[in-house]
Design a protein with these regions (language model features):
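Conserved alpha/beta cores of soluble small-molecule-handling proteins
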Residues: 1-174, 178-181, 208, 217-289
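Glycine- and Gly-Pro-enriched alpha-helical subdomains that act as flexible
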Residues: 174, 181-203, 209
Length: 289
């Protein structure tokens, strides 16, 4: 059965789901998106993702002609039409179709697409062994050039960092900001643990305010684990006891090697495993969200 894709209010089979070559999302990466996760038919922290989508759109002067509730219903409609319970969903909003050119005045209405695909998570073996990461040369675009709070369709900065990481046999890149501080991964936020203290870059480091990042910070505080948002240089990662990255799809993923050097024992740390277990209690519905 072909995947059904939601385009501007209509569900279409994958082979019929088309967007104009004059769409500014295609021409310029001019738009915003969110990646969401469904567990047992419930979209996790859906409202938080939609809030960020609307904030991103507003920041680049795109007016979404629907309410958050309407988009939420559209997400569930797409999920159910594809008979999915455990899935990831990609919600994209472009500025719409216009004649080529940078002027945004000729766009009558945005283009809205939703893709839902079955996803039950990464293999358990990855969480048991951890992933390799690499500090790369590609720097995070500074906030003065592009607001990091905007989850933009133009992902070239992240793609080039991931290319570097892949060439270094790493699954994720550690991107630095222009001041040389640790910023974030290509699709994740970064946390390190040293002597029982959890540290993660602050939003002022030029990072996206990840939904999973916020949940993890709250979980740490609720469970009496000290956590600070503080800038740090990559050298601290090499001497950390533990390291992990967070994202909608990663959840809480241990990082056990950075540029070929073991983090701590080279195995997922106890605190990382505890946070992953607490997070999965949320996704399993054992605590309200």
């Amino acid at each position: 059965m072909l995947m059904l894709i939601f385009i501007n209010g209509i569900l279409l089979p994958q082979d019929q789901a088309k967007v104009s070559v004059l769409d500014r999302g295609f021409l310029y990466g001019d738009g915003v998106f969110e990646t969401l996760r469904a567990y047992s038919g419930t979209i996790f922290h859906c409202n938080d993702h939609l809030d960020r989508l609307f904030q991103s759109a507003e920041a680049i002067y795109i007016t979404i002609p629907f309410t958050p509730d309407h988009l939420k219903k559209s997400l569930y409609k797409t999920l159910e039409a594809n008979h999915l319970k455990d899935a990831y969903l990609r919600l994209s909003v472009t500025r719409g179709v216009s004649e080529p050119g940078l002027d945004i005045g000729g766009c009558p209405s945005p283009t809205l697409t939703i893709i839902a695909k079955g996803f039950s998570g990464y293999p358990d073996s990855l969480y048991q062994s951890g992933i390799h990461a690499a500090v790369v040369n590609t720097r995070r675009i500074p906030a003065s050039a592009l607001n990091p709070a905007v989850k933009s369709l133009n992902f070239l900065n992240n793609i080039m960092a991931r290319v570097e990481a892949t060439r270094l046999n790493a699954a994720e890149a550690v991107m630095l900001n222009m001041e040389g501080y640790v910023a974030e991964g290509t699709v994740s936020n970064i946390f390190m643990v040293k002597d029982g203290l959890v540290k993660t870059p602050p939003l002022s480091a030029g990072i996206l305010n990840g939904v999973t990042r916020s949940i993890v910070i709250d979980l740490l505080k609720e469970n009496g684990i000290p956590v600070i948002e503080q800038a740090f240089y990559p050298d601290e990662l090499y001497t950390a006891d533990e390291c992990f990255v967070t994202s909608t799809l990663y959840e809480v993923m241990p990082v056990t090697f950075i540029n070929g050097s073991a983090v701590g024992s080279g195995q997922p740390g106890k605190l990382t495993q505890m946070i992953l277990n607490l997070f999965r209690r949320l996704t399993a519905g054992k605590k309200s969200y």
